A protein has these predicted regions:
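Per-blade loop-tip surfaces of WD-repeat and WD-like beta-propellers in eukaryotic adaptors/scaffolds
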Residues: 4-8, 15-42, 48-53, 61-63, ...
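Residue position within the beta-strands of beta-propeller blades
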Residues: 12, 56-57, 100, 154
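Short, flexible, glycine-rich and Lys/Arg-enriched loop motifs at helix boundaries
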Residues: 58-62, 103
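Loop/turn segments within WD40 beta-propeller blades
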Residues: 2-8, 46-52, 90-96, 144-149
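Terminal intrinsically disordered, low-complexity extensions flanking WD-repeat/beta-propeller proteins
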Residues: 76, 81-87, 92-97, 101-202
Length: 202
């Protein structure tokens, strides 16, 4: 479950393989806006802190996809195929990146005793920035981010807690102040007030 940075929406995932997006502008009368289907239970949900209508979701072992949604329209913008069960997703507040933690994963191609525990992606190009490999016996159960937004805290299946310094929190993005390409659609970008520089057609 997560709430958008403008506090107008809440998204809830469950074992029914569905994410439900509610308009909570009026807390006394929440309105169901969209149901987003997945192929497995959805545990990982995160609204983008610098673009309130950008939602990312991650599902279990039978799905293994990170999906990006435009919550004003319910549009699936993009997705990333991963190597395992997605247990958490966290956006950076200092750069356009996203970190995913993994539970049950496919063993690493170079070492069958290792698998991906944590992976950082850039957005919107979805490039892998960093990946942390661990023993296949280790699974990330859940994660959180430090109060200064630079360290990821993982709860591990071996009853340990691990801290990874991922980002330098030197500055924070402000909502909506970005170039085009965030949503992968010129129409959605225009609706969000995001404009690319281009020559006027006369």
């Amino acid at each position: 479950m997560d709430v958008s940075s403008d506090t107008r929406e809440i998204s809830v995932g469950g074992n029914d393989n569905i994410v439900k997006i509610y308009d909570i502008s009026n807390l006394e009368s929440p309105i169901l806006k969209f149901t987003l289907k997945h192929q497995a239970a959805v545990k990982a949900i995160a609204y983008c802190p610098w673009m309130p209508s950008l939602l990312v979701t991650g599902a279990g072992s039978k799905d293994r996809k990170i999906r990006f949604w435009h919550t004003k329209t319910g549009t699936l913008i993009d997705s990333i195929e991963t190597e395992g069960q997605i247990t958490s997703l966290i956006w950076s507040k200092s750069c356009k990146q996203l970190v995913a933690s993994f539970g049950f994963s496919t063993p690493d191609v170079h070492d069958n005793d290792k698998s991906v525990l944590l992976q950082v992606y850039s957005y919107p190009d979805k490039r892998t920035v960093t990946r942390i490999i661990a023993s296949t016996s280790m699974r990330a159960l859940s994660s959180s981010i430090s109060s200064n937004y630079d360290t990821i805290v993982l709860a591990i299946s071996d009853q340990s807690v691990r801290l990874y310094n991922i980002w330098k929190a030197s500055h924070n993005f402000s909502c909506g102040s970005f170039e085009g390409g965030i949503f992968g659609s010129n129409i959605i970008d225009l609706d969000e007030g995001i404009h690319d520089s281009f020559e006027v057609i006369r």
